[in-house]
Design a protein with these regions (language model features):
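Iron-sulfur cluster-binding cysteine motifs and their immediate structural context
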Residues: 1-5, 18-42
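Generic non-transmembrane alpha-helix signal with a bias for helix starts/N-cap capping motifs
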Residues: 12, 22, 79-80
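General secondary-structure edge motif
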Residues: 8-9, 23, 66, 143
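Short, ordered loop/turn segments at secondary-structure junctions
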Residues: 1-2, 11, 61, 99
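Short, flexible active-site loop motifs that bind/organize anionic cofactors or intermediates
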Residues: 9, 33, 149
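Iron-sulfur-associated redox domains of electron-transfer enzymes in respiratory
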Residues: 36-197
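Short, charged low-complexity linear segments at domain edges
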Residues: 1-9, 158-161
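Short linker/helix segments within small regulatory modules
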Residues: 8-18
C-alpha cells in the first residue's frame, strides 16, 4: 500500500536502537529501496563558497577501489588520477587518512603501555576505537565492555581535529572557515561525524 513505511523495531528513532550504522541493510535490500544519505550538495556548496577552505581526507580502501565505480581498470585508477580529479572538482587540500591512522595507532599504543604499567587499575583486554560501528556495537550490545575501549579518536576524527588545529596553523588558515570532508568506504563514518562527543 501507499501508506507502507519501513523503520526499525517498534518505530524507535535510530539513536535508540541497536543499529550500528553498518549499511548492510542497504547492500542487502532486495529491491534497492534503501539509500544512504548523500552529502554531495553540502560538499559542493562548501567548495563553491569562497570564504571556506575544503580539506578532504581519503581512506586507504577508497584509494585502492575508487576507479571501479566508473569503469577504470585497477591499473588505471591511480592515486595521482584521484588527486587530480579531486582538484578539478575544487577541493583545496587533499590528504590520505593513513597519516591520522598512524597517529591513532601511536595513541592506542601509548595508552596500552600505560595500561600495562598499571594493570590492576584498567579493564582488560583493551579494544580498539577505530571503527564507529564497532564502538556503537559494544555500547549497545555489550555495555559492560565500554570501559575496555581505547580513548583514542578514530583516524577520521583524529584527522578532523588535526585539520582544525595543526594543519590550520601550518597553512595559516582560520579553523572556523575549514570544512573537513571525508571520503570513506563505510556508512558508519557518517554517523561518527554527527556524534557530538
Amino acid at each position: 500500500g501507499y501508506r507502507t513505511t519501513v523503520g526499525v523495531s517498534q518505530n524507535a528513532p535510530f539513536d535508540r536502537t541497536h543499529c550500528t550504522y553498518c549499511g548492510q541493510c542497504l547492500t542487502h535490500c532486495p529491491v534497492g529501496a534503501l539509500r544512504e544519505r548523500s552529502d554531495t550538495e553540502k560538499t559542493l556548496e562548501a567548495i563553491a563558497d569562497p570564504d571556506k577552505t575544503t580539506i578532504v581526507q581519503i581512506a586507504p580502501a577508497v584509494r585502492t577501489a575508487w576507479g571501479e565505480s566508473i569503469g577504470l581498470y585497477k591499473e588505471e585508477s591511480t592515486m595521482g588520477k584521484l588527486i587530480s580529479a579531486l582538484r578539478q572538482i575544487g577541493f583545496d587540500y587533499i590528504f590520505d587518512t593513513v597519516y591520522s591512522a598512524d597517529l591513532t595507532i601511536m595513541e592506542e599504543g601509548s595508552e596500552f603501555l600505560e595500561h600495562l604499567k598499571e594493570r590492576d587499575s584498567h579493564r582488560w583486554p583493551m579494544f580498539t576505537s577505530c571503527c564507529p560501528g564497532w564502538i556503537r556495537f559494544v555500547r549497545t550490545e555489550y555495555p559492560e565492555f565500554t570501559a575496555n575501549l581505547s580513548t583514542a579518536k578514530s583516524p577520521q576524527q583524529m584527522f578532523g581535529a588535526i585539520s582544525k588545529t595543526y594543519i590550520a596553523h601550518k597553512l595559516g588558515l582560520d579553523p572556523d572557515k575549514i570544512v573537513s570532508i571525508s571520503i570513506m568506504p563505510c556508512l558508519s563514518k557518517k554517523y561518527e561525524c554527527s556524534v557530538p562527543e
